[in-house]
């Protein structure tokens, strides 16, 4: 597959985003944030730039932010993002996947090759994803815009907060995004 070929020929760390809705916006925003912080950043995938068109330009210090669709996840073999994110899963593409269970299974493949040192970011408000996060290998970081989390990323008024076991870290105000 295109994603698999690009992953095998590319270098650096991969941040991969999937979900039914919000993939393009999240990928673009994360690409901008990473581009402001790092020198070698590639924003690829379903967002419009083919992953393979940039993979040979990637260096060991590169960061690739990839929007990955369910269609692309169907054929991964070794693809292993350092950070994966599943934003949400709602009924979609059932003409291809036939059942909601199959669609969910394919979306969850984004974590297939992740190890315990990798991270998967999941939407706490999505019951399917909350349950999925209980039984996966990578570290799970939940996010929510509706409630404060004991650990994870949440919205408190207009402030985005990262709460760890030890501290609460203000990340950015929504008006600054």
Where are these regions (language model features)?
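A conserved segment at the C-terminal end of the G1
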Residues: 25-42
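ATP phosphate-binding P-loop of adenylate-forming
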Residues: 13-19, 27-28
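Short beta-strand-centered segment that lines the nucleotide-binding/catalytic pocket of NTP-utilizing
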Residues: 3, 39-51
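Flexible active-site lid/hinge loop adjacent to a nucleotide/diphosphate
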Residues: 58-142, 146, 154-156, 161, ...
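Hydrophobic anchor at the start of a short beta-strand
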Residues: 14, 39-41, 138-140
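Short, basic phosphate-binding NTP loop
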Residues: 1-16
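Short, well-ordered alpha-helices that flank and scaffold nucleotide-derived cofactor binding pockets
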Residues: 31-36, 53-57, 134
